[in-house]
Amino acid sequence: MKRILLALAASTVLTTAAWAENIGVSMARFDDNFLTVLRNGMQDYAKTLEGVELQVEDAQNDVGKQLNQIQNFVASGVDAIIVNPVDTDATAAMSEAAAAANIPLVYVNREPVNVDTLPDNQAFVASNEAESGTLEMQEICKLMGGKGKILVLMGELSNQAARMRTQDVHDVIGKEPCTGITIVEEQTGNWQRTEGSDLMTNWLSAGIEFDAVVSNNDEMAIGAIQALKAAGTDMSKMIVGGVDATQDALAAMQAGDLDVTVFQNAAGQGQGAVDAALKLARGEEVEQKVYIPFELVTPANIDNYLAKN
């Protein structure tokens, strides 16, 4: 709770800025629904803070381009840097570039590989991925009665979130009451709706039998749903789960197509990242790992989340 309050309650202090502060922001990509909400959350929050300006860049899912952006931020003398990493295994060089210039850096949403060895003026703001896939798979297990066959759609394998959410699935089905569930296919859809649809089309064409689809995010889950419906699948007899609770996912749940998702507070992470960056720029202490909780979303409580992401 202490960590959450640090990220979310600091706004009462930060609104009194008496000088201009420039924060460079490098997003992994602009053409991603969840990351768009995250980016908008940062920009909308910054507008409420006097003298705070964000310079937001699109890395276009290119690691080299993102490192270039970090180097340019350093050269331009920004007060702090926020990074949503393209590749979480490639963050050490970014940390080194910022540290060499003594510019604070905050990673947001995707856990950097060097998270446990970050310099004192660097931090990580996100949600704990040990919760996301666990909440999703536990609910799907419940809906399946603890037995059956599942397909797993993984995000980009270069992202720690994809690896962790997939491991969560394995951990849940490795224990009672879910040991009767087996994985028949597990492939990456790179977080993309189109790739989720293509994978599902291929699985259906191959005649693979399954009872549920477990996706690392909502976009791939929606793609799978589109392919299932195009093939004439009765969605009332199919279980599909995702993560993020995006507006499109909630619409799919209302339509009876998506059974489970997990709310990841994109705007909260964005605000927490800006708060952490400003505090570090002012020489204030920030915990190096700031977590915003995940929350399970089902048809039973969907009304509580319709206006959130």
Specify the residue positions occupied by each region the protein language model found:
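A residue-level marker of the well-folded mature domains of exported/periplasmic proteins
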Residues: 3-5, 18-309
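Bacterial N-terminal signal peptides
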Residues: 7-15
